[in-house]
Amino acid sequence: MIIEDVHYRVVFDSRGNETVECEVVAGEVVAKAMAPSGASTGSGEAVVVSPYRYEEIEEEVSKAIIGMSVFDQESVDEALRELDGTDNFSRIGGNFAITASLAVAKAAAEILGLPLYAYVGGVFAKELPYPLGNVIGGGRHAEGSTSIQEFLVIPVGAKTFFEAQRANAAVHKQLKKIFKERGIFAAKGDEGAWAAQISDEQAFEILSEAIQRVEDELGVKVRMGIDVAATELWDGERYVYSDRKLTTEEQIAYMAELADRYDLLYIEDPLHEKDFEGFAELTKQVKCMVCGDDIFVTNPEIIKKGIEVGAANTVLIKPNQNGTLSGTAKAVKIAKDNGYSVVVSHRSGETEDETLAHLAVAFNAKLIKTGVVGGERISKLNELIRIEELMDKPRMVMI
């Protein structure tokens, strides 16, 4: 079955910003994919270009991939890279490339009568990731709130994905109650997490109380994690928090202290995106998942560099950072072949596209980071509940 038509349109993301959707036609099948966007971005990720270039880029992409087999994903993705001609999709845009790439994969899966996770992951796609839920937000996602960008929860005691998401939603609801009880005004940030004028220390304390209430109510063990987004704190010499300025050595010590004090399961981007040695040193000191996002940007070659020095032990996977499904799959394979865990992630500017849920299962990710509330987040979480029903003997992944 060949690709017969490619069409782009401008749509809107969860922040009300314009983004791009790609539609691929193959036979009777029409498949669509939309591009998300990030507020906190790594310098090495695929470039996003204006969605309003859609007519020009549609013409180029159409010439490049129409007539190709919808089942030859690697060749389609290579054609997109060759069309662009740069190493970061700075000409046609990672947003245009990833949507075409994913739409082709979705079309192929539909033609075969397979869910996307089974088409991409094959017979080994049998486990569900735990939802990594952002429940208190700050940093670039909620100005005037905490210095740490995200305070996260992981319902490790859940036996099903439905139970896991219910626990995360319960923590989110308890936080609302606690803020109200304490007279603290809290609004929702970009990802639906609560944003309030509180310190990082207060956030840890309030979240600990919310988790305890949920564990008592539901009987499900919940662990805590953080996304520091440290590149946003780094001024070239120090990590600048609202109440302190830390050298690299002090930042590593602070992260290790937080991991121990709050029994953190997960720390994302604890140091700035160029500090491979700092990542490696912290990874040696703590027993939790140390995840690289801005440092790796879903780039296979950069991930290899990190592996060589022992930077982190977990890789955050964002397909739009890479630009193609094949490139994203390569990044996943390199990470897993070297003993690193994988976390599949949304962006702060999201859409209702549910593709990410399928990729998390296909890549056997430990966690899926896609928020807790909000239609653009729930679309992925509800899709995972549907996937759980589709599986013959579904089980949660081992963390």
Swiss-Prot record:
Q: Kindly list the places in or outside the cell where this protein is found, as annotated in its UniProt entry.
A: Cytoplasm; Secreted; Cell surface
Q: Where, by residue number, does Mg(2+) bind?
A: 227, 268, 293
Q: Which InterPro entries match?
A: Enolase, Enolase-like_C_sf, Enolase-like_N, Enolase_C, Enolase_CS, Enolase_N
User: What does UniProt give as GO cellular component?
Assistant: cell surface; extracellular region; phosphopyruvate hydratase complex
Catalytic residue positions: 191, 318
Under HAMAP family, the record lists: Enolase (MF_00318)
Know the name of this protein?
Enolase
